[in-house]
Each structure stands twice: as structure tokens, then as C-alpha cells.
Amino acid sequence: MRNVVKPLKGKTMNQFVPKLFDVMKGYSKKQFVNDVIAGIIVAIIALPLSIALALASGVGPEQGIYTAIFAGFVISFLGGSRVQIAGPTAAFATIVAGIVAQNGMDGLIVATIMAGIILIIMGFLKFGNLIRFIPYTITTGFTFGIAVTILVGQIKDFLGLDTSAYTGPTIETLDKLNAVFKCINTFNWQALVVGGVSLAILIIWPRFKKLEKIPASLIAVIVSVIMVKLGMQAKTIGDLYTISSKLPGISIPHVNITMVKNLLPDAFTIAVLAGIESLLSCVVSDGMIGSRHKPNMELVAQGAGNLVSALFGGIPATGAIARTAANVKNGGRTPIAGMVHSVTLLLILVVLMPYAAWIPMPAIAAILFMVAYNMSGWREMISLCKTSPKSDILVLLTTAVLTIVFDLVVAIEVGVVLTALLFLKRMADVTEVKSWKYIGDNIDENNDPDRINLKHVPKDTLVYEINGPMFFAAADKFLDIQTVSGSKAVIVRMRGVPSMDVTALRSLRNIHAVCKRHGAVMILSHVNEQPMSVMEHAGFADEIGRDNFCANIDAALEHAKNIVEG
């Protein structure tokens, strides 16, 4: 009696169990203390970043905190990573700003809810492992483009420009640059000094190893506030926004079918970005702690986190690599640290949020300059441009330029389509059709340098060998298979064909029809599993005759010999 291996249902179901429930087994008091300390430190790091990223996204500063609190807690609680810290990230800044400018907060809530639903569906459909199929050139290109967009968007605040009199559009990157040039006469040197000092602190502070546990962004904010209080003239958050320290209520958007249709591309882009960035953060953190995350559960958690964030007035969220790394470095090893980070931010919101009104806008701009620099990957961009094939460079630069000039939705759509077309061309270039020449029985094999590669081909027999995938982009190459009048057998060797589509099958059918008109028999040699399945499903295997399928080239040549001599 044979042993039957049954599928591991328990293992399949376990991938949808939050990591929190796994790590609670054997959880110690010592680890709890480490998680609490790490969570508090990460919250201090996240505070200025959340405010800055919210402002860069065109929403109020408290909405960045809401996102880190609600989305951060849910994603840590349900997530597939032990140490993931989630919240607002720079990747969403440009797309969120565009949605808010065109559709208001209702549009942002609807887009974020749809993105959350898409992420949950992706998780349950086990798309966690498919995210890696997004080409590296696309992710590098749009990340660089986002960095440039963020940097350009902060120039006006860094220079203290007054753009209140400017009436032109300021949504696209080029529009923002135009606004800077039009309003350059309102330049405020004191704001530049505040921003310059903040930027210097952000660059220099991390070099002091003994002080690295104190976030440079927090020091920059404190110093800039002191400078303004001492008389430096620079606009603060309080000058531009009304800040609330109250907990938000549930936001129910005014929605209609037209809005849903218009925002669907944005929602899909948010979902893809959240999936890519969160899973990339998981991979990085896995390497730091020697663990393995659950990608599908992480996508479900990201979706749930974005749903909750939207309902409580937040913006899109995902795993933040820098904050996750800080969590690990400070001793965080379980999702408890991420949950403590969110609770700490909640306490800060209630107690200290009114003081955020004191933060100068040039300091926020300096923080975002550093965020843009760190995420830009400019060294990697240069390296890829120097070492990559021209087709990859084309995708890289196209995605980056489209992100800067237009928006992320257009960039990703064009980047994916362009990559697909270039991939098809590469596969088509790989596919080749070679013909064998007739080798008679009188060849001197001992003195022929090519004797190893030669086989005896019967008279009136044509032999062709196909290497590479048989698909629509390579279909024209099959026209090289020709039937000469007088031929009695045509062998097509398919050992090197891993796959076939219906377009290629149609070409093969046409070749078979030509063979029949010339009175020749078509023989297929060494047909692999997938092409054979396509032929059987389409009825071509019976059409050509099962006897005309041979296991290898020797059997095919012998079969052809019998046909010719018969």
C-alpha cells in the first residue's frame, strides 16, 4: 500500500495567524521591558516624521499622528512581522497631496478605504510572494522620483517664501518649481537660517555615536523652536494650521460611483506601494533579527490598518523601514513594541500636540529634505545607469521622469507596460528555429570535427529544432519552418521549448496544413509537458496523430526513415 502525502492544511492556515499570537508563547518579562523601551524611543522618532509627512501630503499635522496611532497599532497587532513599525511614509506624500487637492478629504478617505480592501484581497489570494515580481528598475525609479518631488515641494518653506499671492496650480512638481521662481522675491533669510541650522543638526547629530539614541529630528525641532522664540522670523505650523489634540471620531465620507471610478487607479497605486514597501521592510527586518515574516498576513494587516486609518481621519500607511530598523536596534523583538509606539503617540497627541504649533516650517522642510535624500537611492540610480542593459535604463529613467513630471499612477502604469513589452522582446529574441542538414550514410565520422553533433537524417526528411518559448511575440520565427516539395517527413524537435501559447499553436497548425498539402508527415520530437498539454486540450495531438509524437530525436529519425522507406 502506497503512502499518500496529504497537504498540510495546518501550515496553510498558520500563514494567516498574526505573528503576535506566535511570539506570545514563552514571552518573558525581560522582553516586555525591552519592547516597551523600544516602542517609546520609536514613538519619539516617529513624532516629527509623522507631522512632517502629513504636511508634505497636504493634510493637517495631527492626521500624520492619527495614522501612526491607528494604522500602526492595527498593523502591529495583526501583522505578519515580529518588528514592523507602520505609519505615514514618504512614498505616499505625492499621491496623497494630489488626491486631496483634486478630491478633498472625502476623496482621500475613499481612496484609502479602497486601497485597504485591495490589500486584504491580495493577502487572502496569497499575493504576498508575487509582489517581488515588480521590477527593481520600477521601484528604484519611482522612489527616486518621489524623493525629488518631496524635495522640490519643501523649497518654498525652507526659503521662507510667501506664496499666498500666487494663483497658479501647485499640484505637480513643475508647478511647484514655477511657484518658487515666481515668489523668489519674498525670500526670508531668517527662515533660511532656521532651516539651515535644522538641516545641519540632522546631518551632524547621527555622527555622534553616544547620542544616536536621541533622534536628530527631535533635536532639530527643539533647536528651531528656541531660535524662533528668541526672535528669528519664520512661519510655524500654528501660523498655517489649526491643531487639535482631541481624539478623532469616525469619518464617514460622501461617496458616489463617479468618485469611486475616478479614484480606483489611485487606490490601486496606494495598495501596490503599501504592499511593496511593507514587505521590503519585513525582508530587511528579517535579516536583522533572523526571523521569517508571513507576507500574506502582512498584506491583510496593511489593508486592515489602512481601513482603520481612513475611518479615523488618517492617511495611507505602510511599514516604515527606518522606524522598523530603529525598533530592532533598540531591543524591540515582538509586535508589542509597535503597539507601545502607537499608545505612546496617543498620549503625546492628547498631552503635547498643542505645542506642535510652535514648530517652524523651515525645520519641517529640513526633516523632509533628509527623508528625500535617504530614500532617493541616488547612488543606486547612478550604478544602475552605468551597469544595466539599455532596456532596464530606459524603464528606470522613464519611471523616474514620469513620477516627477506627472504622478505616481502614470509612472507605475507606463513602467509596468514598458517592462512587459521589453520582456516579451527579450523572450522573442531568445527563441530560435534551426534547420538540420541532410547527412548521408557515407560520411567519414572519424575525420569530421563536427561528428558529435551530427546525426543521420534520412533522405526526403527535413529536421527543424526550436529553442525557447513558443509564444505570440516569436510566432513569426516559425515561418522559417518550410516544407520543400518532395519531402516525405518534417521533424520538429521541441526539446528546448518550455512553454507554448495558442498563437504559437496556430502557427504549428499552419505548418501541419502545409505538410499535408505537400504529402509530408509532420513529426514532433521531445514535446515537454506544458506544450503537450496545450496541444491535447486543443485537439492538435489527435489531429497530427499520436504515432507522430516521439520521445526523442533518435526515435523521430527512425520513424521518419520508416515513413520514407515505407
State the predicted function of each range.
Residues 2-443:
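Transmembrane helical cores of multi-pass ion-transport proteins
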Residues 38, 199, 203, 476, ...:
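Short, contiguous clusters of charged residues that form electrostatic/catalytic patches at enzyme active sites
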Residues 85, 524, 549:
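Conserved SAM-binding loop
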